[in-house]
A protein has these predicted regions:
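Extended, highly charged
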Residues: 1-203
């Protein structure tokens, strides 16, 4: 099996099974599949460095097109099964800044609630986002990125020590250009296809 691209699902493209096996993941990260773990370990630890890798902070704000909150349901959230409580975003990369530990990347499922400007998010207890919420008193800015570089997709799935910035890990695998969000104090990869900006309100 390989990646599956559905060209038109309610007017949007849907990509599934992007990394069907370890070899596909290795190739997408520019790593020799035969030396996947040692080569990847050397890069992530900083033992070896790639030419041109690193973060570059651009003096720019993300996004040429802005979708108002009232049109949030027009974004490509999918309803997977009959009886689902609503449409879901399943592979968005969440970026938050913990006031103690710094930037954290993670995956969270998000369901659009009845209100057009609201979403319900499952946050795993005592992991990165939950810790950031606790350290911030329950109010926390977030940027949800769709269509990010493979390096970011991969490092967002890791569970390094709390003080390790997964975006910096991604930048050890390749160059990541970062731009500012419009409404929250965060940076996102410039090549994202879509960014949803919002705030955990503590309610």
């Amino acid at each position: 099996p390989g990646p599956v691209l559905l060209e038109n699902v309610g007017g949007a493209q849907v990509l599934a099974n992007l990394f069907p096996d370890r070899d596909a993941l290795a190739r997408s990260l520019g790593v020799d599949p035969r030396r996947f773990l040692p080569e990847l370990g050397d890069l992530l630890s900083g033992k070896t460095r790639r030419r041109g890798a690193g973060t570059r902070h651009q003096d720019a704000v993300y996004g040429e097109v802005e979708v108002p909150l009232r049109d949030l349901k027009k974004l490509p959230f999918l309803t997977y099964y009959r009886g689902d409580g609503g449409p879901f975003l399943t592979a968005g990369i969440w970026i938050v800044r913990d006031p103690v530990h710094g930037v954290n990347l993670s995956y969270h499922r998000m369901m659009i609630a009845a209100g057009a400007s609201e979403g319900t998010v499952r946050v795993v207890s005592d992991r990165g986002t939950d810790t950031a919420l606790k350290n911030s008193g329950g109010r926390l800015d977030a940027a949800i990125c769709i269509g990010v570089p493979a390096e970011v997709l991969f490092t967002a799935s890791l569970s390094p020590a709390p003080d390790v910035n997964e975006m910096d890990l991604a930048a050890r695998l390749g160059r990541i250009d970062l731009v500012r969000c419009k409404t929250v104090d965060l940076e996102v990869p410039a090549s994202c296809q879509m960014v949803i900006e919002g705030t955990f309100t503590g309610e």
